[in-house]
């Protein structure tokens, strides 16, 4: 059994502890240990190989308490019973802080902090003659004789009475700003030793396993305590998490922090984010995602005065159809985001359609996209599209892997049907006014494309090619410019035929070859108007041009010309060639037969035979 000498903190005049020789000489293998409690300080002389358990036995007899109530702390670390003082680096002159736990049971760490640090954050050595120094010094520094630790009272009633306002935010903030607490919290080894000594902390960690992560990282622990100092943030987090904890809980009508500074933010953004939070936490459903469309209004730079939660974007009533223009498209979703296949009802066709136009104007929840249309263009067939959800899709959940496939199919279907609808409308318009089709075909008349054109006329035009051609010619200014060019060339051939030899190469390259004998009665530029358009007048000797007639016949599907004699079949082309100065009847006929009635190719062939 080691020899332990306990003396009071009173120091003799020689400033050496009692029981120690005046000369200060200590026998080898014996060390002096300063034992500090919140209310007293003692110096013990023990052997350096003394175990912590043996030292606790002597301290328990000295303080008249049970050994289980003693907690020894040195250099910020708890001393375990199986350790020795030398193993823990305790040498002569070191300080060991003693914590005596209450007999009524273990108190929580927070309660101990409140009782101790709120009233006496940094206890100092009560001995005015001794080596007094504060407890709040750097932990882990072996050069100093005083180490930092947490000081708890043997009995809470001996030191202070519990302050009824200790739990206030101000008191908690002062406690956390104390240097003792900050240094103690930065010591992760000490924090790991707290749960075994406090059953209430063990219960807390068992019920909430995520709390154990706080004890592994001092930075996270400090951030958590910093967050705990701001009760407003904690209340806001609780409000946000309240719908997640209770799915049946009604949405919190209170706005989020900071939304009151945004115009109408309490109405639009508050409920929008509330709905989005509920949708993400309670499961993503189709009808939930399409329920609130406030983002559409934000994209259109409009702030809704009132945000409601209607059913799936109901279409406007039937009586409102008359107020909508023929090109307006009503769609139930904004930008086609994660939607299931829907059925669309068309006025002119029964085909399904999915339209995804750009948002031009948004009014309320109806989501009407108005497509402006020039006044000069004739109105096409009305294409109102109303998307109505299937009854079976209202309560279905979107699979994760199928949304991209649905979106791709919808875009492809939308492109095909929009193209087919425009093509059908333009074809109907051209059938009503066949002279427009004849003028359009003048664009595709270069001699080097004649063979390609004959191959194309043998089979119907591709839908995409015809759509591009019709869309390009749908502009009234384009059609008017083409007609003016043709009219000017015809006037040039009539008024100044001497210039034709110089411009004929350019006319051939552009596909224009106008007989010089053609005379148009109307010399005023035309205005493209489908309702009042009158076919231009031309003598019977030159009806339009050979190119136009050549290409109108395959398109019209009339096969009777193949049974006629070449003289009858190419009679009009022959007249045009004669009017241009080619008087050899047989040569003209052979050239037309060889070129299958192509007037431009026949002229080129005749000029080559004449050496031009």
UniProtKB/Swiss-Prot annotation:
InterPro entries: UBA-like_sf, Ubiquilin, Ubiquitin-like_dom, Ubiquitin-like_domsf
BP-aspect Gene Ontology terms: ubiquitin-dependent protein catabolic process
PROSITE patterns, sorted: UBIQUITIN_2
Domain of life (superkingdom): Eukaryota
Molecular function terms from GO: polyubiquitin modification-dependent protein binding
Renumbered residue ranges of the record's region Disordered: 1-25
GO cellular component, one term: cytosol
UniProt-listed Gene3D superfamilies: DNA helicase RuvA subunit, C-terminal domain, Phosphatidylinositol 3-kinase Catalytic Subunit, Chain A, domain 1
Any Pfam family hit: UBQLN1
Domain Ubiquitin-like per the UniProt entry, residue ranges: 31-105
SMART domains assigned: UBQ
Disulfide pairings: none
Residue span, UBA domain: 564-609
PANTHER family per record: UBIQUILIN (PTHR10677), UBIQUILIN-LIKE PROTEIN (PTHR10677:SF9)
Protein name: Ubiquilin-like protein
Source species of the chain: Rattus norvegicus (Rat)
Recorded name of the encoding gene: Ubqlnl
């Amino acid at each position: 059994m080691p020899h332990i000498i306990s003396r009071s903190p009173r120091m003799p005049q020689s400033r050496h502890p009692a029981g120690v020789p005046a000369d200060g000489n200590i026998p080898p293998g014996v060390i002096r240990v300063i034992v500090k409690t919140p209310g007293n300080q003692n110096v013990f002389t023990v052997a350096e190989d003394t175990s912590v358990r043996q030292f606790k036995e002597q301290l328990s007899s000295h303080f008249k308490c049970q050994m289980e109530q003693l907690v020894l702390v040195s250099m910020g670390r708890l001393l375990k019973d199986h350790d020795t003082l030398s193993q823990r680096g305790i040498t002569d002159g070191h300080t060991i802080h003693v914590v005596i736990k209450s007999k009524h049971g273990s108190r929580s760490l927070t309660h101990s902090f409140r009782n101790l640090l709120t009233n006496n954050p940094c206890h100092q050595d009560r001995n005015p003659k001794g080596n007094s120094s504060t407890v709040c010094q750097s932990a882990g520094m072996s050069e100093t004789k005083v180490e930092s630790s947490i000081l708890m009272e043997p009995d809470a009633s001996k030191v202070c009475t519990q302050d009824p306002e200790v739990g206030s935010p101000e008191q908690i903030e002062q406690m956390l700003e104390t240097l003792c607490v900050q240094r103690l919290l930065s010591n992760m080894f000490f924090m790991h030793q707290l749960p075994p000594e406090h059953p209430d902390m063990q219960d807390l960690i068992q019920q909430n396993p995520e709390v154990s992560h706080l004890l592994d990282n001092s930075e996270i622990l400090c951030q958590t305590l910093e967050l705990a100092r701001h009760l407003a943030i904690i209340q806001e987090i609780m409000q946000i998490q309240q719908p997640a904890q209770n799915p049946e809980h009604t949405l919190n009508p209170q706005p989020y922090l900071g939304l009151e500074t945004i115009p109408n933010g309490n109405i639009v953004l508050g409920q929008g984010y509330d709905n989005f939070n509920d949708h993400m936490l309670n499961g993503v459903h189709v009808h939930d995602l399409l329920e609130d469309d406030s983002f559409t209004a934000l994209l259109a730079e409009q702030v809704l005065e009132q945000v409601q939660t209607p059913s799936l974007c109901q279409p406007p009533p039937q009586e409102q159809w008359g107020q909508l223009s023929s090109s307006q498209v009503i769609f139930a979703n904004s930008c086609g985001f994660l939607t299931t296949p829907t059925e669309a009802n068309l006025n002119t066709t029964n085909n399904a359609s999915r339209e995804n136009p750009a948002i031009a104007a948004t009014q309320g929840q109806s989501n009407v996209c108005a497509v402006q249309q020039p006044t000069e263009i004739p109105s096409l067939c009305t294409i109102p599209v109303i998307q109505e959800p299937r009854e079976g899709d209202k309560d279905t959940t979107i699979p994760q892997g199928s949304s991209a496939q649905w979106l791709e199919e919808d875009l492809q279907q939308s492109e095909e049907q929009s193209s087919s609808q425009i093509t059908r409308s333009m074809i109907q318009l051209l059938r009503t006014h066949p002279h427009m089709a004849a003028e359009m075909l003048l664009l595709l008349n270069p001699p080097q494309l004649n063979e390609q054109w004959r191959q194309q006329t043998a089979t119907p035009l591709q839908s995409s090619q015809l759509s591009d051609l019709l869309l390009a010619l749908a502009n009234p200014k384009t059609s008017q410019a083409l007609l003016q060019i043709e009219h000017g060339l015809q006037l040039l051939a009539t008024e100044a035929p001497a210039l034709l030899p110089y411009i004929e190469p350019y006319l051939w390259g552009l596909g224009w070859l106008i007989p010089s004998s053609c005379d148009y009665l109307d010399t005023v530029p035309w205005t493209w108007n489908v309702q009042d358009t009158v076919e231009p007048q031309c003598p019977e000797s030159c009806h339009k041009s050979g190119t136009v007639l050549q290409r109108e016949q395959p398109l019209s599907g009339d096969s009777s010309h193949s049974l006629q004699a070449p003289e009858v079949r190419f009679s009009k082309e022959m007249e045009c060639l004669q009017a241009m100065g080619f008087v050899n009847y047989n040569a003209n006929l052979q050239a037309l037969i060889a070129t299958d009635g192509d007037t431009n190719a026949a002229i080129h062939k005749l000029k080559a035979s004449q050496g031009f």
